[in-house]
Amino acid sequence: LGDVYKRQILFSTDERTESGPHIRDSVDIKRVMILVVLSLIPCYVFGAINIGYQKSLTYGLETTWVENLITGLMTIVPIIAVTFMSGAFWELLFGVVRKHPISEGFLVTCALIPLTLPPAIPLWQVAVATSFGIVIGKEIFGGVGMNIFNPALMARAFLYFTYPADISGDKVWALAPDGYSGPTALSIPAGQVNANATDLLDTAS
């Protein structure tokens, strides 16, 4: 029993390996990060279609899935662009200051952040949240592999507590119109030429 007790996972063995226990192949951090980004593409496609579909429901329109996809892409592409530009700026800045190679980890972070944001969010908030998530959530801890928080969720949490009206609720997830325009009760008789007010009231009643 003593030998079994000593071989448990809480104790280390006194045996030493003669060769490296790791498999060395072409799959490095860059390859893994790119695969993660590529695996998120279906999520973006579905999200774009859903954004267009929700907008068509809001406006009471009948649209195809291709039209919904185009509408969604027109909405999320600016968000993605701002996210990647902000992330690349901070990654390059910290890489130059610390004199270390640029890591591809920010690609995954910048690919995840737009998936957590509503479609109608202001682009300046996207830039601020991305900067907060990468700088405070990752870079101050030393970069890729040393952060204790998820940078994408740090960006989401930052927006939730600083701009709750733009990040929470049901209305922010649909591209609703700012307002409706239509004739008012006073504009209808005002548009009549040579009309009698009494006759208009009698007609309306």
Where are these regions (language model features)?
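Short, small-residue-biased leader/transition segments that mark boundaries at the very start
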Residues: 1-5
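Hydrophobic core segments of alpha-helical transmembrane domains in multi-pass membrane transport
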Residues: 36-49, 84-91, 115, 131-134, ...
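Membrane helical hairpin/interfacial module
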Residues: 42-109
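Cytoplasmic-side transmembrane-helix entry/capping segments in multi-pass membrane proteins
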Residues: 100-109, 127-128, 147-156
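Generic transmembrane alpha-helix motif of multi-pass integral membrane proteins
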Residues: 109-119, 136
